[in-house]
Amino acid sequence: MASLLWGGDAGAAESERLNSHFSNLVHPRKNLRGIRSTTVPNIDGSLNTEEDDDEDDVVDLAANSLLNKLIRQSLVESSHRVEVLQKDPSSPLYSVKTFEELRLKEELLKGIYAMGFNRPSKIQEMALPMMLAHPPQNLIAQSQSGTGKTAAFVLAMLNRVNALELFPQCLCLAPTYELALQTGRVVERMGKFCVDVEVMYAIRGNRIPRGTDVTKQIVIGTPGTVLDWCFKRKLIDLTKIRVFVLDEADVMIDTQGFSDQSIRIQRALPSECQMLLFSATFEDSVWQFAERIIPDPNVIKLRKEELTLNNIRQYYVLCENRKDKYQALCNIYGGITIGQAIIFCQTRRNAKWLTVEMMQDGHQVSLLSGELTVEQRASIIQRFRDGKEKVLITTNVCARGIDVKQVTIVVNFDLPVNQSEEPDYETYLHRIGRTGRFGKKGLAFNMIEVDKLPLLMKIQDHFNSSIKQLDPEDMDEIEKIEY
């Protein structure tokens, strides 16, 4: 599990337990909603209309975030370099290699070790001394799924809570119901030995009458419900909040209304409240939002090492239609040794058609698309990771963040394009980046119609890489392909 793991061996069991936990929580028609996602499975389990299937399968940021948390089996050993910008450049910059150096409460140390974790991750080494400092320091941090950021801010909240004071002291905003529950599970596990510290969820369906005396010290919720609890129902006194966490900021600003609601909540907080913001990306819109909501922050950025195409051999095959593409795919399968493969389609219709064709020809195939619930997607990815299926056919929902060591081939059954029908360079990079990982060699095949050839040439020029034409009828040529 992504945000639970700090570097121990507890991951696989926790992943399985959380998969089970969420499958009991999420109703088929209550899957993550509102963030660009337009379709979910019908209530009877049937698939949606063909009109929906013709649309590009657009990535749902919140669903992807939850999916990555569910499928992570260990802490990500990030190759990113951590860049720290202090609000006071003259102050000494501290980092830690052990949890003991943080001088935590004994019950917190016990909770950390009971979870099976032993040392801070790379980003935690720099972030935790700032988050636990006295007086409190504000922080804006770029942190991707799997780097231990949820555990870090949960530790900060638990460290500042006074169990004897029975009112909300820490407030955490998450973009969805499911992500709020996920964070709460981390609080419950890490705070296992923190006697009399409790969590409350300000999420849809948790109806609390106006005037109720809320005695739980940590509140986790979505912006709309938290806003209602604070200003309409008067359940939370924001002037008493000591730690304010805004998680998944990039997802927040992608959701209509959430950024304004978050800012309104933040403006009612006391000046001495510690404010922490986390985002997987630092695009201009995210950065502008972060600067509006977090005053005088320290900043932690990940200087990302670019995905490289140097260890991926790229080919293209000219085809007339999708049946042509499928025949070319069969020829490639017949000519080279394949471990596991991921095949990307631009629409659900093509993904479903290809799945049926391959299954009828006896291939072990699984289909992954945005209409599935997050739990269904996590189950499919785990089966693929376990080798129960050798081919994963997917839309853009799987373009990034899913690492399977056995993947040796990526096929673009359709080239990724944007709404202007121009090449989507970033998606292309992340698609073929599913192979050639962990220092291994990989192969990428692009199945394209003749009229799409100019798009492929733009991709080749953009990445300054070589994409060779392959004759799918020349089996001798195919058999000579090496990783």
UniProtKB/Swiss-Prot annotation:
It is an enzyme of class 3 (hydrolase). Isoform 1 is expressed in germ cells. Isoform 2 is highly expressed in Leydig cells and weakly expressed in the pituitary and hypothalamus. Isoform 3 is weakly expressed only in germ cells. It is found in: Cytoplasm; Nucleus. One of its GO terms (cellular component) is chromatoid body. Changing residue 66 to A: Enhances nuclear expression. InterPro entries: DEAD/DEAH_box_helicase_dom (IPR011545), Helicase_ATP-bd (IPR014001), Helicase_C-like (IPR001650), P-loop_NTPase (IPR027417), RNA_helicase_DEAD_Q_motif (IPR014014). Disulfide bonds: none annotated. Residues 130-300 form the Helicase ATP-binding domain. A motif (DEAD box) lies at residues 247-250. A motif (Nuclear localization signal) lies at residues 100-114. GO terms for molecular function: ATP binding; ATP hydrolysis activity; mRNA binding; RNA binding; RNA helicase activity. SMART domains: DEXDc, HELICc. A motif (Nuclear export signal) lies at residues 61-74. It catalyses: ATP + H2O = ADP + phosphate + H(+). Induction: By gonadotropin in Leydig cells. Inhibited by flutamine. Changing residue 67 to A: Enhances nuclear expression. GO terms for biological process: mRNA export from nucleus; poly(A)+ mRNA export from nucleus; regulation of translation; spermatid development. PROSITE patterns: HELICASE_ATP_BIND_1, HELICASE_CTER, Q_MOTIF. ATP binds at residues 143-150. Phosphorylated on threonine residues. The phosphorylated form is found in the cytoplasm but not in the nucleus. CDD domains: SF2_C_DEAD. Residues 311-478 form the Helicase C-terminal domain. It holds the Pfam family Helicase_C. It comes from the Eukaryota. ATP-dependent RNA helicase. Required for mRNA export and translation regulation during spermatid development. This is ATP-dependent RNA helicase DDX25. The gene is Ddx25.
